[in-house]
Amino acid sequence: DTVAAVVRHLEQLSAADLEQWIHLAKSTGWHVYLQPKGPDTVARLWPADGPERLTYRIGEFGLEYQFAVTDFTQINAAINRAMMMQAMKLLDLQGSERVLDLFCGLGNFTLAAATRSREVVGVEVSETMVHRVLQNARHNSLDNIQAVTFDLTKSIAGQSWAKEPWDTLIVDPPRSGAKEVLEE
């Protein structure tokens, strides 16, 4: 698993500051990125080369997730692993279920559920994250995943996936959104 730090700075860093960040990165093995302005200004400081994708693994499911430093992920690996294990235990998937994962993000629960069900459809507002779900599905050789871009704070009534019969529903929303979608 890769650890990365994004250093948000509003003023130009001095050569000494940059050297300290590089020293920290080398001594810890972290990837260090600088962000002088908005999210589109994030650039890697160290290591100077290598893959741009970061990874985390959930060995219990045989999964490796690839993500960009600016993607949202669960930051506490131990809590994330425990949360996924508990969710899959509660879902008790037997391999024949159709699962709908709302607010799927990069596919944290989507991929885990796909290892234990017939089909999973993830729904997420961010096109980047939908792309990441599909990318991670291919990376992990999972062919039973679909992902849809949709803003779940809007009415789902006209969406074809909302009219289908689902055996299991996963809802892992951001701070807002669950109330609206579950009321429908």
Regions found by a protein language model. Give the residues of each.
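Accessory RNA-recognition modules of RNA-modification enzymes
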Residues: 1-171, 176-184
